[in-house]
């Protein structure tokens, strides 16, 4: 079984989030039991399931989808 990308979710707060190809999404403002909440420029908010986090290098969180899929998680 593969180890989760993030072991301590509180450490991702205020870190940058990027899509799988490195495009910036915004910064992580909060997390709950199943999602991370990402705020981007232009006051856009995204609620992204933690299952889509593929890596965390200590300063960047990498998601497992391309920029084109980001709007699926946008809060209206």
Where on the chain are the PLM-derived regions?
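Peripheral interaction segments used for macromolecular assembly
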Residues: 1-76
């Amino acid at each position: 079984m593969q180890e989760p990308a993030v072991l301590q979710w509180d450490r991702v707060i205020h870190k940058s989030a990027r899509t799988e190809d490195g495009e910036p999404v915004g910064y992580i403002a909060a997390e709950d039991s199943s999602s991370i909440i990402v705020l981007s420029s232009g006051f856009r908010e995204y609620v992204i399931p933690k299952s889509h986090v593929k890596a965390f290098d200590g300063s960047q969180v990498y998601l497992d989808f391309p920029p084109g899929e980001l709007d699926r998680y946008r809060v209206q």
